[in-house]
């Protein structure tokens, strides 16, 4: 499937692919070292303590409609097997590891479910919504998360806001 995202840890690159596959590549000799098959259209990926956290974004149903998933897979990086599935907000896309936690953005369903910045505690496997109406994130300097919120009012007027979220303090600037 179409490669989507990549994360490198130690001697391996982990690549998510549409069609429900994660490929484990040995970066020393560029050989395929393992494969996980599951889900549908996989996007963001991050490694934390030997576990891969992978966003299972959406499925296309029999009528060619997009159905947004609410899943982050936890995959054992050594064996490339599914350990568990964590429920998150619809349409998860990007994941980052900061200060021992996993942070992710979900895009929502573009109708009645808004995008959200969320965290996953790797120790408990639970997810929590931090902020709603967040549409894009990236990790930045000083372990800050840079956020964009793009929302529309009842007349379809776009409003953009840019801010940072500090995972250590919870401060929004």
Where do the model's predicted regions map?
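Predominantly soluble domains enriched in secretory-pathway, periplasmic, or organellar proteins
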Residues: 1-173
């Amino acid at each position: 499937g179409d490669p989507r995202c990549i994360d490198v840890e130690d001697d391996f690159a982990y690549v998510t692919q549409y069609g429900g596959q994660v490929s484990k590549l040995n970066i020393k000799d560029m050989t395929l070292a393992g494969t996980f098959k599951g889900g549908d259209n996989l996007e963001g990926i991050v490694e934390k303590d030997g576990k891969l956290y992978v966003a299972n974004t959406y499925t296309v149903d029999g009528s060619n409609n997009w159905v947004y998933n609410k899943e982050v897979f936890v995959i054992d990086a050594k064996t490339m097997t599914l350990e568990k599935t964590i429920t998150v907000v619809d349409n998860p896309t990007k994941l980052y590891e900061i200060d021992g936690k996993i942070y992710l953005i979900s895009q929502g369903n573009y109708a009645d479910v808004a995008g959200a910045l969320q965290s996953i505690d790797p120790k408990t496997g639970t997810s929590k919504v931090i902020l709603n109406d967040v549409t894009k994130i990236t990790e930045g300097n000083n372990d800050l998360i840079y956020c964009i919120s793009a929302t529309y009012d009842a007349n379809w007027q776009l409003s953009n806001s840019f801010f940072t979220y500090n995972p250590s303090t919870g401060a929004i600037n």
